[in-house]
Structure formats: C-alpha cells, structure tokens
Amino acid sequence: MKRIAIVLGLAAVVMSCARKDWRDASLTAEERASLLLKEMTLEEKVGQMCQYVAPCYVEPGKGSARKNIDATDENLGNKDLSDKVRRGEVGAFLHVMTSTEAVALQKLAQESRLGIPLLLGIDAIHGNALIEGCTVYPTNINMASTFNPELMEKIGEETALEMRQRGLFWTFAPNLDIARDARWGRMGETFGEDALLTSEMGKYAIWGFQGRDGKYSGNHVVACAKHLIAGGEPAGGLNAAPMDISERKLRELYLPPFVAAIRDAKVGTVMAAHNEINGIPCHGNKWLLNDLLRDELGFDGFVVSDWMDIERLHSMHYWVPDSTEAFVVSVESGIDMHMQGDKYFEAVVAAVKSGRIPESRIDQAAGKILAVKFALGLFEQPVPEIPEVLDGAAEHRQTALEAARQGLVLLKNDGTLPLKNPRRVFVVGPNADSQTILGDWAVPQSDDNVITVLDGFKAAMPNVSIDTLCFGGKISNVDAKGIQMARFKASAADVNIVVVGENSQRYSAFGRTCGENCDRDDLSLPGMQQQLLEAVVASGKPTVVVLMTGRALSIGWAKENANAILNAWEPGQMGGQAIAEVLTGQVNPSGKLPVTVPRNVGQVQTVYNYKHSQYSRLFATNETGALWPFGYGLSYSTFEYSDATLSKSEIGVSESLKASVTVTNNGPYDGDDVVQLYIRDEYGSVTRPVKELKAFRRISLKNGESTKVEFDITPEMLQCWGVSEKWSVEPGDFTILLGSSSSDSDLTPLPLKVK
C-alpha cells in the first residue's frame, strides 16, 4: 500500500507539471518564459531578439520636421514591419512617441500566432520627455549637482508612471558613463566624473523606475544601465572613440556604477557601449558581456545593443568583414537584442540552422526577454489603457521644480546676489527665452509646459521693468549689431542677467552645440556669446551670468569679470522659475559641481581624483589646475565645519570606524549644504589618487542651527585593486578628509593607521 501511495503521488506530480501553462499568472516570470519557449518556433524566438524603431518615428516628413539626428541612418524604412509583427518576428520597438501608436502596435502583435506582446521602449533620460506634454525634469548632470539620490528615486517613480500611462514599459536609462572629458557632448546625460556619485544616483534612479524589489510591478517599468563600458572618456573627446584602459582603472572607476545597478538595484537590462576597449568592441566582447557581466557580477537580465552598433562592428570598427558576421559574433558574445535594422533576423536564424549558434543560446536570450515581459504584466494586459490626462502631472511639475532648485550651482558671488530690489533689469542672451532649457532627449514642448528664464523673472518680479534681447533663441543670431544694442540696453539697467551657454536640442531647427554626437574641440562659449558678455560687462552695471549648458565650459574671463555666475546646466521645464527664485533670494542655492571645470580645453582631462604625479610639472603659459573643483558650490549662507573626529585612529584591515563633523549655518539664511567625505591612501602597492569621494550627505539647516554629521567608514571604502589583481585593504597610512568640496582648502584632514 505504501508503494502504491508513492506511485500515485508521483503520478499526481507529473500530471500537475503537465498541466502547467505559460498563461498561468501564478507561476514565476521565469517559469512562464520557459514554458512559452517550448511552444515557439526558432523564428519566433529570434523574433524576440529583434527591436525596431517605431514606424511613425520615420514616416515621410517626420524625420526632417523633427530634425532627427538619426533619420539619415540606413535601414530605417522597414516596409514590411506590420507583416513581421504578425509573424512574430519582432519583439520590441523603440521611440514609440504617441500612445495611439503604442496601442496600435500591441493590437497588431495580438494577431501573431502566440499573441506575444511587444516591449515598447523609449529614451526617458530625464523624464518621459520624448512625449509632448510629459514632465521634463532637469538633466542628469543637474541631478548629480543636487547630491540627492532620494530625489532621483522620486523622479524615477514619476517618470515610470508617466511612461506606463503612455503605453511604454522600458526606459533606456540611467546613463552610468563616467564623464571625464568635457569635449564629449554627452556629459549632460551622465552623473559626472565620480564613481561613487554616479553609483548612488544611478542606483536610486533604477529603484525609482523598477521599484525597490526590482520586479517592475504596479506603475514601474524596466530600466537599462548603459553604456557598458568606459565611453565617457573617449580619445579626442569624440563619441564612440576607442578606449585603452587598464583593468585596474576599469574596476575602480568605470565598473562600480554597474556593480551597484546589478547587485543592489537589480537592473533588468544593460546596454553595450559604442566604443571598443583594449582593441575589442564592446558589442563583440565576450569577456565583458559574459565573464564579467553575467558570471562575476551575476547579471540575470538581457543585454541590448545600442542603435545599430552591431552593424558597426564592421562599418565603424572594421573588426569583422561584413554585417552578417557582426550579427553572429554579437549573439555569440552575449548581446540578446538587436536595436534597429534589417538582416539581423535572417543572419541569426541561418547561423542556428547551420549549427554555428546553438539553439540553447537563442533560448537563453529569448527567455530572458520573455521573462521581463511576463514580470511587467504585459501578457495580462497587452493593450494598454491610455488615460486622457496624465495622473499626477501637477505634483510631478513640483518635483521638477524642486529638482531644478537643488541642482543650480552658484559659482561666484561678490555680493550682487540675491538681487536687492532693482527697478530695471535687462535679461539678455540666446538662452534667456528658449527651450534649450530642456536639454537633450526632449521634444519641443508647448509654451505653457516650459518656464524659460525670462518667464521666471516676469513672475518673480512683477513690479520691475524688464527689458530683453533674446536673439530669437538662436546662438547664431548673436551678431555685432545685436551686441551693440545689448551694451546700450545694459547701460540703462540696474542689473543685467546674461543667459548664455549651449544648445543640446536634438529636434531643434537651431544649431546644436552639445548633446549626443555633438562633441567640441573648444570649451569656450560658442558663437559670439563671449563678445556679448564682454559688451554687457563693459556697461559698468552689475552683471550676473546664467550658464545653460550640458557640459563644463571654461569661462575664465567671466570668472574674473562678472559679478556673479550661476551654473544652471539644463534644468528642465521648471528651470526658469528656479533660476529666478535663486537670483531673487526666494531660494538659497545649494548645488555642488559633479565635475571638475577645466581652465581651458588644453587642460582636459582635469579631474579631482588625479594621481600625485599628474601635476609634478606645470603648464608653461597658463595657470595649472581646475577653474572650479569637483563638489564646489556657493550658498547665500556661511557654513562652518568644526570638531572633525574619528572614532578610532588605528584599525585592522577588516575593521570599521566612524567619522563625524559638526556643521553650523552661520546665516543669514536657512540653507542646504552637502557634507563630503574623501579618503586618501597615502602609500600602496600601486599608486593611489590624491583623494576619492567615499560618502556624502545633503543636510538642511536653519539660520544659526548646528548638526553633527556622522559617517560609517567600512573596509570596502579603504580597499583598492592592488598588484594581486583583487580587492583588498592594504595596511598603512590613510587620511580621512571632511568638508564642503574636494578642494584641500575646504577639507579637514584626519590621519588613520590601518594595521
């Protein structure tokens, strides 16, 4: 009887397993994906690995109307996309820029044999800003200037909600590149030059997009950590240029943000980088995409290519003889999804049938893509319900405003700010009344969805006479005649607000000077803006510079001659209000630089965490060193740092300790400051940087208030990638530095001995 019971029990288990169906929502996403794979043909599996740009993105007239920088690329006009979707040969689309198209594409996918929904993605880099009417938050470089990861998480949550409400479920964000060359046009997409700051901001952004559990439930979407790896310090500052780096530099500088994204935030997807590292293009680098990413870091999601970068293994890198070989090598190396273009599908199917690519590799890639779709709930509701009005739009605008306020960096102030009841204000410059305030990765918005600097001043100073000269929002319109007019108007004002900088708008008809594939060999103000600034200063009236840019600009003349400088970066749709509030004293500035500002283009790459020998020699014809240091930013208040102490002066290699410092706001205003902790390893088996940021905390203090700020210092904060080619804490002398910026003059050093 006992034996019969066991047999019957086993039979019940077998029958139960046999009844399992991929439509059963009680199963895990991975279980459902595995079951669905068994019902799919090879062609349907490879179809999941194919992503195309949305048809409406490139329909006749649209590309030229938007001035789309990608519209001239090959393979955009896929005539038979509808048939491909019906055959199950498309797994995803990107740049679905209307909810109408999102619904139509998902309905089309339901006509396929298995009705597998599409994964619709978009570059929601700083808000769902490629969709008109959605919230355009400050760019990532602005957000890094806040040193406020929790605010970054909130923006991620709100962006995810707005994406869901427009039928989108996958954002190609955050950008985790470490930006160490201001010539590179994509600095504004990043969180700056530091590994820790980028790691924290990126991790919290992913938590916002995906949820803390990494399951994309509710109103969350799947995020994408990009670009793997080391594209932020390209040769010559040119996007996609080669990188030759040591494994030590890769692990200590470029990899930590991805480690945090994968191990802490459980990011669902990773995008490979345009560039090569050490002679191997990232899209064909098996060590990078498999040995490091999956085996060592434990990444369990899927890897997507960047825009047609698989083809560029042949056409740009000249690494393989043709695109067919590029497609096959990319799959062998670990790329799971191809972003945009024809011929990939046919090449991969043929490679499997010939035996070159095992079908198990296709199952791995398609299975991971399907698991994400199941986790997102797409199979339960493949066709999204689109609300007429975005939920939370007013609240999201307030978040965008607060982010803009916190990200503004005051670089200079001789007492001119905050403005003291002027009667006549002259607002001048091509960025004063322009949507350049939105930055890259944003479509033109309706005027009522954007507050420009001029709009902000009109609202903040309703009883003040405001004169303007905005040059039609075009940098190229600044000419000798306009400059002469500006000097005349400046002479009649009590104070002049000069809004200059760059233009990152990819869909603008005006000349771009910054953004993706817009790199420069000059870090001065483009066009005749420098002459404009000099003419206004020559009026003899107080002059405030508002710098609107996606990269660090070398404005040494302005530093010497302007009365005040506010680095606004690209603060988004509410930026004009935030700028006006700061300049008029309604808000106390509190942003800190997430990059080092070089003195001139000849001094890139200037970074704060350089090696001791970098400045053992000085430039012969100019001052050596940063124009402004990393972590720097002024306030209208004076913050005093005192009583910096360590809980221990000597520890073992596996021990932790605490560091603390008292911060006092000596007024005269309430304000925020960012307390920064740096560590210097004085001597080691390999040479070490002069300092490295290891912790930070944003604090708010009332006028006259004090607080004690305490940090835990763990062994992980003391370790390095030594000659043994592994992480370890090396015994010896360390210095803990506490203060308000990376400048030695703003830091208190505390010695620490590690035994």
Regions found by a protein language model. Name each.
Residues 1-20:
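Bacterial Sec-dependent N-terminal signal peptides
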Residues 17-721, 730-744, 753-755:
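Glycoside hydrolase catalytic-domain context in secreted enzymes
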